[in-house]
Amino acid sequence: MNSKLVLLVVGVVFALVLVIGRQGGVVAPQSISVSPQMSTAAPVAAPIAFPQATNVAMAVEPMAAAGGTVAAMESPLPNFVPRNLKVFEGHWQGMDGRLMTEELARKLNYPRGVQGVLLGEVTLNAAFSGLLGGDVVVRIDDTPVTNMENFQAATRNVANRSEARISVIRKDNRPGTPVLRKLTVVLRAAEGGLGFAQLEGAPMILPGDPRPHGYRGACTDCHPVGQGFELSPDPDLISLPPSAITRDAVTRGVSPHEVRGPCEACHVIN
């Protein structure tokens, strides 16, 4: 009888222990094993901002890789901006000009030895004066023009004047042997003087960019290397979606442009 009573008491105690454990009883400290690596909180890396344009190399903190080893994050190269870049083009009173080189002469069928500033485009006062794209500026008043630097110097001489004589070489566009004519036009400014030419370098290129032209020496003779010096994307290459039109306009076939397909292909129809 006593043995049965002992067994009954033991069973009740065991059951109470199980119930207390399931309801969140206190667990002995010895039952928890804490790893030394877990006891120290890992430092949280601060976010790293990479500005698009910088000339200073940026230090980057190493980050722990998934396997536990420390791997250095690759930092972007800083922009490379040479101090002495060749002048690429100049702008003055609506002229967009660049140095006439032997390469350009061959491409555009000009005789060898022509020196001056080749006008790629003319607008504003340059167009009103009679200049054309393809003209080669060889003299401004009495100052010869053989490169971009003395083109700017020649314009400085007339900057405060309201007019100047521009001598150019113009090539006949008929096929065959090029025929050149020398012309002199008068460039006039309505007010404020003619000012002087502004010179610019070649645009920035990305590291490793393929060369789009023949060899002209080291890329860094003309170009900064990196990103951030040009607006990207070019807004002129972005097409905005057409405005919404009414269903009535579609039904009546009212269109402000020629037929380009179903209206719903481009327009939201309300």
Curated annotation (Swiss-Prot):
Which regions face the Cytoplasmic side of the membrane? Answer: 1-6
**Cofactor detail note:** Binds 2 heme groups via the magnetochrome (MCR) motifs.
Q: What is its EC number?
A: 1.-.-.-
Q: Which Pfam families match?
A: MCR
Topology in the lipid bilayer = Single-pass membrane protein
Q: Which cofactor does it need?
A: heme
The UniProt subunit note reads as follows: Homodimer.
> What is the protein name given in its UniProt record?
Multi-heme protein MamP
